[in-house]
Amino acid sequence: MKPTQAQMAPAMDSREMVSPAVDLVLGASACCLACVFTNPLEVVKTRLQLQGELQAPGTYPRPYRGFVSSVAAVARADGLWGLQKGLAAGLLYQGLMNGVRFYCYSLACQAGLTQQPGGTVVAGAAAGALGAFVGSPAYLVKTQLQAQTVATMAVGHQHQHQGVLSALETIWRQQGMLGLWRGVGGAVPRVTVGSAAQLATFTSAKAWVQDRQWFLEDSWLVTLAGGMISSIAVVAVMTPLDVVSTRLYNQPVDRAGRGQLYGGLADCLVKTCQQEGPLALYKGLGPAYLRLGPHTILSMFFWDELRKLVARAQHQGT
């Protein structure tokens, strides 16, 4: 019996193969485009994750309550443009992290590593880890900028940066080069599991949808459906590490550049669960899905469709 596409779970359709360098550009571009649409949700998610940090439930004010009211609260406090706080840093992060991530994943596909059992998971995880490390300084600045607001609505530590370049300069001057990678211990596991889930499930989900024959073989709806299924897996595995990563990046530091609240990933997990309860690791889950879900769907959709266009153009030119 002939195996289905889902059983074969091809890492990359041979008709859509492009060079790793092209994948770098397409992956970075696709995720930057998705970021423009989802950044307001990232602002809300960041503030919900910082609200009530290391305080017992019910003992702190809650300026942000749920998704819709939080969007309105941000707009009232910071203006409509406040919903795009940290956008420049977010675009820088998406370009750096996903450019590296898709480049490395494409190299793995080209080498045939993703055709091995579990290959897509391993390749996605390794590519995500490297991308997270490269993009960490941009994510650090993005988180701190998105947390900044007026005193009456402030949650978490307020860093008072004036912009991306100002923030990078301040961190470099006060903490040195290593300060730019503070919090990377939470970012790498976060993106590692998220990338593994995203790239592996997107490949399998797209093949599964194709097998159902709900849409034409090359329809963009196949890609969209694959992205929607993939987004569920991404949010499920990333949210606890996303909360931890946000807090590690935003915490104040002493003169030596050491975090004043957490000693690292494990310390943050333990303190958060002890003082706020285990459910605190899912703070901002609604906005997290509303942000990570559409971002996963849009980024994978843009990436896959752009790859098809480039591959067809290359094929027609030969």
Swiss-Prot record:
Pfam families, per database record: Mito_carr (PF00153)
Catalyzed reaction equations: a dicarboxylate(in) + sulfate(out) = a dicarboxylate(out) + sulfate(in)
N-terminal signal peptide: none
Keywords linked to the UniProt accession: Membrane, Mitochondrion, Mitochondrion inner membrane, Repeat, Transmembrane, Transmembrane helix, Transport
GO cellular component: mitochondrial inner membrane; mitochondrion
Record's function text: Putative antiporter that exchanges dicarboxylates and sulfur oxoanions across the inner membrane of mitochondria.
Protein name: Solute carrier family 25 member 34
Organism: Mus musculus (Mouse)
Source organism phylogeny: Eukaryota, Metazoa, Chordata, Craniata, Vertebrata
